[in-house]
Regions:
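Short glycine-rich phosphate-binding loop at a beta-alpha junction
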Residues: 39-48, 72, 176-178, 279-285, ...
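Gly/Ser/Thr-enriched, mixed-charge loops and adjacent short helices
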Residues: 13, 107-232
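Phosphate-binding and adjacent anionic-ligand microenvironments
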Residues: 236, 273-451
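N-terminal small/polar loop signature for handling phosphorylated ligands or for N-terminal nucleophile
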Residues: 32, 39-106, 192-250
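Short beta-strand-to-turn element immediately C-terminal to the catalytic PLP-Schiff-base lysine
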Residues: 111-114, 248-252, 332-334, 424
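Proline/glycine-rich low-complexity loops and linkers
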Residues: 125-161, 166, 252-324, 332-333
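An N-terminal, well-structured beta->alpha segment
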Residues: 1-62, 66-68, 93, 149-177, ...
Length: 451
């Protein structure tokens, strides 16, 4: 069996790869693992708004209960809310049913330990072993009072909203904010948080129907938010993705701020307050050259990890650091939460705007972004490209043309059948041509996937 877990849990097309049967076996596996430490471990389960969410939720919960675990079902709730609530409410583990920014036919299942952290690779390997044993009917099947219970608690999202609001000391009274919920997990709690802080909130894409999550909206399709911010003469636009573990922002001029810019602003705020541990902010290999240059000029150090918020978090925990994240909008404030948190991130920036009494476009001026081109090549196979001499030669040629003023980065996606080609440097047209040349070669050598 191929490895089930990718960089963000188990993810795939529902009823093709991610079936109710697999969700059931994952539940049995997780309850078996956490049951080693405690009889009847209690899990918190949350989900996003996909049509398949309730089906997978039922199967996962049934699997947990069948080996003696207990379940509390929170319903639709952001991923970072589950991470926070597991820790704050004393659950033994958590599970989130979501495929984040992916389209609605996909879904996923990821687990958190009792401290609100995603599971390390070695634990996921153990879960995979238990999944195989469950499929072979080798795991225990208790009877009588050995079977677990299921409870429903739809109020837990309000605890999370209260937590996020109290991470800042500033009222947002007088601010006009356009909020794009991506028709996802924060469609209700996002507006609750912002209005609770005193902002005037204009909501878009907060009416999920099971099929419209991330559909031309949210952080992966931010154009509508840019238009809405200017139409409403708003101070700020906030876009979450489907599970609200990331956010991108739009300033009053309709310009987008990505994760690099957001975490740099927040890191500088913490530095000025004497709260930025080791004066260091953690990015990834995808972080813009301008991010590193600006941080250095502002007296901060930067570190780059592999792409994936789990790798950013791993480094932050290892070195006891405050802020890190990804260009895509995953920003982690480890003093507040244990995973990327879109709403928590957004309110930090809104508070900064109020405290400085400056528009976001001015605050964002601390960083000059280098032009960056990214092409996603949907391939038949995303393995083996590193050893392909033709692909390697194309990359070396492009790097030679950019010299010391730029860079080329090619990597396989951890969650989709994609190879990503990124180039960065001073000239947009040159970058586009270099990226396209490499992308075309990868498509020929790796085989283009069928649409």
């Amino acid at each position: 069996m191929a490895r089930l877990f990718g960089t963000d849990g188990v993810r795939g097309v529902v009823n093709e790869f991610l079936t109710p049967e697999l969700a059931y076996h994952l539940g049995r596996a997780a309850a078996t693992y956490f049951g080693k430490e405690k009889d009847h471990p209690t899990f918190l389960i949350g989900r996003d708004t996909r049509i398949s969410g309730s089906m997978l939720e039922s199967a996962l919960a049934s699997g947990i209960c069948s080996v003696g675990g207990n379940v509390v079902i929170a319903g639709v709730i952001p991923t970072p809310a589950v991470a926070y609530l597991v820790r704050q409410q004393g659950f033994d583990a958590g599970a989130v049913i979501s495929a984040s920014h992916n389209p609605y036919p996909d879904n996923g299942i990821k687990f958190f330990d009792g401290n609100g952290y995603k599971l390390p690779d070695e634990v996921e390997d153990q879960l995979e072993q238990y999944v195989r044993q469950s499929a072979d009917n080798e795991l225990p099947r208790p009877t009588g009072d050995g079977i677990g219970t299921i409870e429903y608690n739809s109020n837990l999202a309000h605890f999370y909203a209260h937590f996020v609001r109290h991470t800042i000391d500033t009222s947002l009274d007088g601010m006009t904010i356009v909020y794009d919920g991506a028709n996802g997990a924060a469609s209700s709690v996002g507006p609750e948080i912002l209005s609770g802080l005193g902002a005037k909130v204009i909501n878009i894409n907060v009416n999920p129907d099971g099929l419209n999550i991330n559909d031309h909206c949210g952080s992966t399709h931010i154009e509508g938010l840019q238009v809405a911010v200017q139409q409403h003469n708003a101070d700020l636009g906030i876009a979450n993705d489907g599970d609200a573990d990331r956010c991108l922002l739009v300033d009053e001029k309709g310009q987008v701020l990505d994760g690099d810019q957001i975490m740099l602003l927040c890191a500088l705020k913490l530095k000025e307050e004497g709260k930025l541990k080791d004066d260091t902010v953690v990015g990834t290999v995808m972080s813009n050259i301008g991010f590193h240059k600006a941080a250095e000029e502002l007296g901060m150090k930067t570190v780059s990890t592999a792409v994936g918020d789990r790798y950013v978090l791993e480094y932050m925990r290892e070195h006891n650091l405050s802020v890190g994240g990804e260009q895509s909008g995953h920003v982690i404030f480890l003093d507040h939460n244990t995973t990327g948190d879109g709403m928590l991130t957004a309110v930090q920036v809104a508070a900064l705007m109020k405290e400085k009494n400056q528009p976001l476009s001015e605050l964002a001026g601390i960083m000059t972004k280098y032009p960056q081109v990214l092409i996603n090549v949907r391939v038949a196979t995303k393995t083996g490209w590193e050893d392909n001499d033709i692909i390697k030669a194309a990359i070396v040629t492009a790097e030679g043309e950019l010299g010391d003023e730029g860079r080329v980065l090619v990597r396989a996606s951890g969650t989709e059948p994609l190879i990503r080609v990124m180039a960065e440097g001073p000239n947009q047209e040159e970058l586009q041509a270099l990226c396209q040349e490499i992308a075309d070669i990868i498509g020929r050598e790796q085989g283009l996937a069928e649409k």
